Amino acid sequence: MASTTGTEATPSRISLSQDHLGILHDVKVNTASIEIANSLLQKNHEEWHMFFRDRAGHNHISHSILTCLALGGSPEDIQRAYDDGLEIQRPMPPLDDALVARLGDDNVMYESLGSISQYRSFLAYFQHHMEEHGWKATVTKYLFSHTKLSEKMLARMYEGAYHPVIHLGLGFEFQQPAIVAEALAQAAAHDDSNLYTYFIACEEESEIAYPLQQAKTLLQIMADASSSKTIRNAPHWEDYGNKMRDGVLGRACRETANVASKFVIRKTPESLRRRTAEMIDTCAYVAASSQRSGRKRKIDFFYMHMVTSSLFFSVIGEQDWIPLNDRIRMVEWKARLDVAWYVVCGCADIQQLALTAYNDPVTDGMGWEELYAAVVKEHDDGHVSKMIRALKNGQEAARPFENGPYRNAFPLHGDMWLKAARMTLGTTTGCDEDTKFVMFTGFDIPWETRPDLQ
């Protein structure tokens, strides 16, 4: 994993290579951009906490820089990506050397999970483990060894609206052990909304279910969740930021698991590829088409995360050093969590016409190249650029299936991908961070309190 400067990427050193600059390979990345990205990613790695606040405060700097780079950003664009995320960051927490020395004991690690103040200690431990055993062996031990600890760690990868698994996917995609170490430390330190219980409940429900003659599509499963009064009414507006933990999982965990468990992938590489593409397609369709009649178009903040994280399951699917069954399990968990997030946001009405009829004066006529060039200039924390890149990946992933025998599982097809990308830029350009997206779009209150969307 040597970079353009010949320096090896290590668990503590960022060193990007021309050989690993993103899954799409659809733009030229210049050497100067790589060099400044290396410098700024290293600075972020050494100086800034993974959490700018303890609750729902993820450091997006590496996401923004790597996405900007993969979209062909100039050195100035890379610097902008860093600067836009800088003001809110806080310094690394203190290193607890005594804890680091004990984290090799799985019981100590297990009992320490959820300690955000120990992020730096987790990071130091995972870096040390990688230096001794290699980064792939470390990932295998802590995510795929099927121990009590690794099961909890794998579930925690999906916490915080998918942020740790996004981070992990970036580490895989750009072949950066230091980013992978950050992802493992982020998952270990993250607060817990009880996703582990939900994922295990889904697997238990799947094991006892009578096999369906024909597998349900992910979109059908989401519709089934919406049609259940118990599930649909589980999240309350008054749950605020805890609609997943206290709402869906607190009031209807088993019921939601029963419905979501119907997303099952046969144990073949072909099925993994197709159903990963279906998951990506469905998430993009739901995010772009969940709109409010009579209001300006605005994408939901959490549905957006369903899309931005989806790209990394294409990346994970290509990691043949991970056992096939574990890669399949990760995609099953992703799709089942997508069902829960669909419910968290109020089971929004899905209106295809809201997407197919979309136009705006900013993005009309833009192709992918023009969208890339525009979005890397946007003042943003990486969400908009990540979504556009994920949509392009979705177009490529879904293309082999959208006109074949499984076409009903792929509601987004043809030029709808480009329309969705135009909507992503057109509805966010020029907006401040608080108005780029709408939160919990299926509820009335977000729309009633947004005069800008009248």
From Swiss-Prot:
One Pfam assignment: Questin_oxidase
Keyword Amino-acid biosynthesis: no
Keyword vocabulary terms for this entry: Oxidoreductase
Leading EC class: oxidoreductase
Entry's family note: Belongs to the questin oxidase family.
Function: Baeyer-Villiger oxidase; part of the ergochrome gene cluster responsible for the typical purple-black color of the ergot sclerotia. The ergochrome gene cluster produces several ergot pigments including the yellow ergochrome secalonic acid and its derivatives, as well as the red anthraquinones endocrocin and clavorubin. The pathway begins with the synthesis of atrochrysone thioester by the polyketide synthase (PKS) CPUR_05437. The atrochrysone carboxyl ACP thioesterase CPUR_05436 then breaks the thioester bond and releases the atrochrysone carboxylic acid from CPUR_05437.
EC number(s) given by UniProt: 1.-.-.-
Pathway: Pigment biosynthesis
Official protein name in the record: Baeyer-Villiger oxidase CPUR_05427
Cofactor section: NADPH
